[in-house]
């Protein structure tokens, strides 16, 4: 009955009045694809497939890409024994027989094909434990419909006895019975018909397309061309283009040469095969308008308009001298991240073109050479992998992170023996996974990245002995041998075609193999840059190429945390962000691409995130220098946010203030504060302007800028900015925090407020006005303090405002954000920071206004038995929770918690998975106690059988826990 009541309220919210409070998960909802909101049809299907007891799908179209998008989930539910039926239409012979074959391979799914030309239904019905979920709308089982296209689907929660369930099941069964069972004989016949229609479609497309038509710039290229025009109008003669692999950098350079009307052009790169392909690209743009030539050691032509060469050839002094320094109007340096080498420097310093363009996917270098300075910090345009996916400049990829083999119970690590890397078990697993995940057209053309040359050679030999055609390429192979191998990989001649190329790192960059449809990674991830470079080898668009398959064998590697950094483009190096990305998966990635991990590999990534020190001085300095090089000046905290770089609070955590960190790196920085003002800056940077809350920071900003403001005016400013009311409690809170009475340190071995230790006067309240205090007023007279103080405020407010866009704000806390105990009690307006050990799992505030509850979900084995409470979620809304030891139902704190709702005492819940996550807890929402589920029980030491009384109770969250975080915490 409870479900029906909740459903009724949810229907009222969805259909009658949006302001009616009800269960969000039961409300009618439009399911669509919206990357900005992190919404995908795929995510909803993923979730419901894993929640249901049985499912029924009917779709007009199914493609291999659509099934691959759901593949990991379909495997999971097969293992769980969740049965399903899928009815597919033969409408227009669009459904892919390869997709049907994959679906038929699942023992738990019954698949039928209906041959009625007017069957165009798209419906998904899920039977849950006590209800049904129905999705009807526009989405077929294709990768674009599930992740990218503008779709319109209605999701309804239904009771078992509802009329809609009866009708939906009846209609499904009627058509399912009309459908035919799919035999191998039928599939073979249908494959012939499917191929016929597919080939007709390809032929029609070719007829409609003039292969010699002049190419036109894509959306990204148009923006970059506009910027390049603008730079030249400002008389700027050099610029850097940062563009992800396969997004059309070379064509862009040709378009810009055309729009600049350059007569003589030089294109320099480090390999001849790239130079030759660049020449072909320019020829497609200019056709017969210009002449083209390769400047080689054997034939150094200089009569052509456009000359293509390598850095090694041209840097020869004799070769350089054949050109006047002003011979070229326009020079292009491809793979510009290499421009710090002596050969490139010699070329760049010799010539004086009217315009110099550098192009790279990865300007970040580890050798301290400043690529940005070389181009005077003029960035013409920047598009990284995630943006390229959004703009559909590359093919979608389906990434599968799978567990590598175990040897004697342990996963392979960086020090694995050669015998284990190339053993029979691993070879068989690589082959099995390659066949299982396959590729878009069932004709594998794979590039396999290994960790050692010997491994690549041996694996190639073992693949060949099993009937595959493969080759191993290393640095010892000539460029001609590499080109021949690439031609064989792309060949349509089955006698000469290669299935696999095994390599180590020679294909990390610059190699263009558009037909690659599978990438296998057999090496630990040592660099997110190299990971993206290797992934990029298969992302270039090509005729009829639908997607790229990526198979990553994940072992017990220290740097597994770099995998989410690379895949999701998150360079904040926030452990919390990385965990959320791994958990959220597909909804966090643009377009039709998907990211899948098996459970063991996912745990290995979590372990790596937990154990990694992401804030070493070396890493901090590296990211600081990267941004400094990019900007051409010392970056401030706000610059890190605006450039999507490392979260700058990490510099504060390491050095007490950002100024302290900068001073430790910049030897010539003459910006020293006196000890008093430095201490004040450190306190504000660390304890107040840390991005966790906003009210005290906003007031601090206003006070420091205006010196005095009336409460009435401040109330108005706060409401206009945040739609939050500012009352007397807020004034008390602000004064307590900003005057540093809350924060405690030790003086003379006693816990003492910072205000009493340092005698800082920050803000005064008099005559209904807030006025700046003398300590802050005097400090702001010092320019260095002024700059770094206001920067920390700008960072804090911006960080908070970025977070609040994507989650609920609940009386001071952002749902699903992480907080330390210190920040939690501050936000809850405790007058003095408590001794956190004394608070333990919960603590009632002195004014009985709140009682924060802390749960470490997975307890450490070495803690005392009296702290090993078995707190656990019974579902996404219900928490089974235990009091402290030596408590009964009559204990004061227990009574206060039981009667919290009656007495308006808030029970905010803070949870972390385990102690490896550090000192921060997720805020999950506020709790309400179920007075009908209170039990006195015991907690017992299993060793000595000693017991202590405790109280067990059920509590309900104000909002069901978000699915991905729920899974992360409980698994």
Please provide the spans of the model-predicted regions.
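PLD/PLD-like phosphodiesterase catalytic module centered on the HKD motif
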Residues: 1-218, 222, 337
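Long, largely alpha-helical accessory region at the distal end of helicase-like NTP-driven motors
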Residues: 196-219, 228, 429, 435-436, ...
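Walker A/P-loop
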Residues: 233-257
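Conserved strand-helix element at the start of the C-terminal RecA-like helicase core
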Residues: 265-274, 420-466
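Conserved helicase ATPase core of P-loop NTP-dependent helicases/translocases
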Residues: 294-295, 299-300, 319, 457-458, ...
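Post-DEXD/H (motif II) to motif III coupling segment of the RecA-like Helicase ATP-binding lobe
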Residues: 338-397
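Conserved interdomain linker/interface between the two RecA-like ATPase lobes of SF2 helicase motors
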Residues: 379-447
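Conserved segment of the helicase C-terminal RecA-like domain
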Residues: 528-533, 537-567
